[in-house]
């Protein structure tokens, strides 16, 4: 178990190389044939690549990108969650907003630990609160690669971004591009991956909260300040305080859009989504909802 612990926690290339040699001798050498009938290892990362090939290419890998035929065992399926909600008298739509979103080989997958905790506590909340989560997210979203910040903003607003997962070397210390950074977050579970569209996205509100906390502890001061006012905006909206609502949305508009796209429809939709960033924690959100004439961006 945790075969990749050394890979994830060490920047010492010599140590990693020695560790891979050890694994090779254990699982792929001529000597291992005398004592090994079958090897089964688990971890977060796929087996590290050496010159674009797996260091242990005699293993069959199942990852967050490709998991057939064992996909249904990765977490709770939607049908299983519906049954649990019925058994524990929990609102399915709320559970779905908090913990759904992973689309693995076409199967909707829910975080099993979080769903279990929600059923036991009878409360939808973030059960992914350890500080290492925020540190892991920050490590990758603050990397200085062209377009990375824009992609993070797009995903925070509910969008998807194209990502090429092929160049990632399955090593968190070997990141050379925006695509590598996003692929690392996919394997760590902080991003979902749509294989049909080859795109990444933030899967649910629980993970969005982890991103929110990461932004507060990182270098994204302007974004963090805007997000910190989301609850204030939500309360002002409920109270019918149009002056306060206008003020906070104007701040969000200035924060999340450029002068060139200030009145662009997609930009305005992004502004509303980010301005009400914490709303899914309290309400089921519907985007592009039919509203008589036209559509409501955010209901």
Model-based region annotation:
Residues 1-266, 278-286:
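Phosphate-binding site recognition
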């Amino acid at each position: 178990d945790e075969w990749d612990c050394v890979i994830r926690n060490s920047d010492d290339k010599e140590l990693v190389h020695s560790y891979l040699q050890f694994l090779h001798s254990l699982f792929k050498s001529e000597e291992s044939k005398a004592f090994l009938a079958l090897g089964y290892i688990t971890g977060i990362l796929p087996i590290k690549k050496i010159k674009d090939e797996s260091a242990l290419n005699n293993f069959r890998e199942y990852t967050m990108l490709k998991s057939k035929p064992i996909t249904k065992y990765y977490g709770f399926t939607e049908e299983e969650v519906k049954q649990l909600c019925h058994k524990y008298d929990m609102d399915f739509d709320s559970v779905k907003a908090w913990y759904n979103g992973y689309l693995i080989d076409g199967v909707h997958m829910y975080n099993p630990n979080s769903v279990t905790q929600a059923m036991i506590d009878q409360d939808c909340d973030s059960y992914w609160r350890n500080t290492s989560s925020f540190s892991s997210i920050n490590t990758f979203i603050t990397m200085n690669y062209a377009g990375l910040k824009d992609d993070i903003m797009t995903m925070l607003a509910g969008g998807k971004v194209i990502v090429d997962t092929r160049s990632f070397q399955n090593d968190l210390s070997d990141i050379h591009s925006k695509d590598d950074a996003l692929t690392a977050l996919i394997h760590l579970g902080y991003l979902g991956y749509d294989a049909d569209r080859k795109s990444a996205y933030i899967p649910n509100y629980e993970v969005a909260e982890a991103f929110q906390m990461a932004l507060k502890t990182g270098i994204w001061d302007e974004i963090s300040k805007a997000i910190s006012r989301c609850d204030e905006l939500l309360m002002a909206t409920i109270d019918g305080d149009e002056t306060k609502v206008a003020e906070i949305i104007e701040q969000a508009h200035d924060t999340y859009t450029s002068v060139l796209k200030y009145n662009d429809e997609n930009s305005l939709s992004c502004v509303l989504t980010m301005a009400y960033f914490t709303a899914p924690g309290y309400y089921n959100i519907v985007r592009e909802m039919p509203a008589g004439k036209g559509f409501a961006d955010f209901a």
